[in-house]
Amino acid sequence: MPKPEIHPTWYPDAKVICNGEVVMTTGSTQPEIHVDVWSGNHPFFTGTQKILDTEGRVDRFMRKYGMGGAGKAGEDKKAGDKADA
């Protein structure tokens, strides 16, 4: 049995509130828990998540390190520099 007067009050039906609406109940040491985001309105869990990657990662890598189409243009430029010298 727990010692009296040292443990916080336990609320077995504490309300979890998001945007003024009770979304669930749980056990807690506070009677009400106010949250900004929960699984019912988070974009990841609702399926409304938008992917902002407009450029493919592989294409970006190829362009950055000169592989693929951008690399061939760079090689032509180097060959032209040698002809000018």
From Swiss-Prot:
Keywords: Ribonucleoprotein, Ribosomal protein, RNA-binding, rRNA-binding. Residues 73-85 have a biased composition (Basic and acidic residues). Belongs to the bacterial ribosomal protein bL31 family. Type A subfamily. GO terms for biological process: translation. The keyword Oxidoreductase does not apply. It comes from the Bacteria. One of its GO terms (molecular function) is rRNA binding. GO terms for cellular component: ribonucleoprotein complex; ribosome. InterPro entries: Ribosomal_bL28/bL31-like_sf, Ribosomal_bL31, Ribosomal_bL31_A, Ribosomal_bL31_sf. It comes from Synechococcus sp. (strain WH7803). It holds the Pfam family Ribosomal_L31. Binds the 23S rRNA. Residues 65-85 are annotated as: Disordered. This is Large ribosomal subunit protein bL31. Part of the 50S ribosomal subunit.
